[in-house]
Amino acid sequence: MAKAKFERTKPHVNIGTIGHVDHGKTSLTAAITIVLAKTGGAQATAYDQIDAAPEEKERGITISTAHVEYETKNRHYAHVDCPGHADYVKNMITGAAQMDGAILVVSAADGPMPQTREHILLAKQVGVPAMVVFLNKVDMVDDPDLLELVEMEVRELLSKYGFPGDEIPIIKGSALQALEGKPEGEEAINELMDAVDSYIPQPVRATDKPFLMPIEDVFSISGRGTVVTGRVESGIIKVGDEIEIVGLKDTQKTTCTGVEMFRKLLDEGQAGDNVGILLRGTKREEVERGQVLAKPGSIKPHDKFEAEVYVLSKEEGGRHTPFTNDYRPQFYFRTTDVTGTIKLPADKQMVMPGDNATFTVELIKPIAMQEGLKFSIREGGRTVGAGVVTKINN
């Protein structure tokens, strides 16, 4: 069946369902599509179709993820749902599914459980900006006092991990009732989508952020100077703009004297473009792959940071043995590898393949870095882990 193409006139937001196993994430995802399909905002997608999530590879890591899309009056959404807990951990750490916001699903019958906590913590670590709560399975709870208690617990948990627990909208409903077409079930879904529309902030578009381009290659063109190539990650670069070359060495200032794409000269390059940028007065040997071009003052080089990391299992082609303190692999940032030393927290002796962990890293050379930057951990050319910078330490 051909997919109906959505008109992309509305602002776009990436979202996902998170929460403990069997609390109803996939049922809720199905219910959203089925309720919104009635007003033409989605293609109704059954639970089984979402649950049979295809496997995808992101930086050598196998992740099962289901994608659905739908729209409300105000926005167009791409929604991710994962079948297993490990898939969430991998997804959030690798950024395979970029989330501008999340719907935390908590079963009213069980209250917050271990993975509820872990997903809230992960969301905080990887920088998910906001979340809305769906208190599911309320049809199984007869006592209103119990519902109130669960809601209080959820709010306390959110506050504990740095989310505004008192402000976050909590919608009570039953995904099952919505799937069965019961009016109270559908009403809760509509209420949830209104909350998501109003509470999850509109993400800043890549072109509105400061200019940043990771350098992939450097050429010398006789009579014209040095050209660096790469894909613009964010912002816009115009001919005549002053820029900085950041990372690996001391930061240098230069000016962009030309932008070209597909051998044509342009006035500007913007986020998503693969461009060549001509640099005034910069020698070929002063620039290298792994540095970035950036708007002056927008990003700094750092060599010490804290990270949340997923370590590949043996089956995924990762290590067969755990690693301990002072492990020294390569950290692959954007376009290059830098050696670094891992310092584990005092209470952790080792990290097992298939685990996720928080630890500190010290690189031998600084990299242009900001919180939220993703990286891979490599050993002898193969990927053994994936991580995200959660805090910069120097």
Swiss-Prot record:
* Disulfide linkage: none
| Residues reported to bind Mg(2+) | T26
Q: Indicate the principal place this protein occupies in or around the cell.
A: cytoplasm
Protein's cellular compartments: Cytoplasm
Region described as G1: 19-26
Residues the record lists as binding GTP = 19-26, 81-85, 136-139
In residue numbers, the region (G4) covers 136-139
User: Might you give the EC number(s) for this enzyme?
Assistant: 3.6.5.3
Q: Report the catalytic activity.
A: GTP + H2O = GDP + phosphate + H(+)
Top-level lineage group: Bacteria
Protein's name in the database: Elongation factor Tu
* Species annotation: Rickettsia massiliae (strain Mtu5)
Q: What is the lineage of its organism?
A: Bacteria, Pseudomonadati, Pseudomonadota, Alphaproteobacteria, Rickettsiales
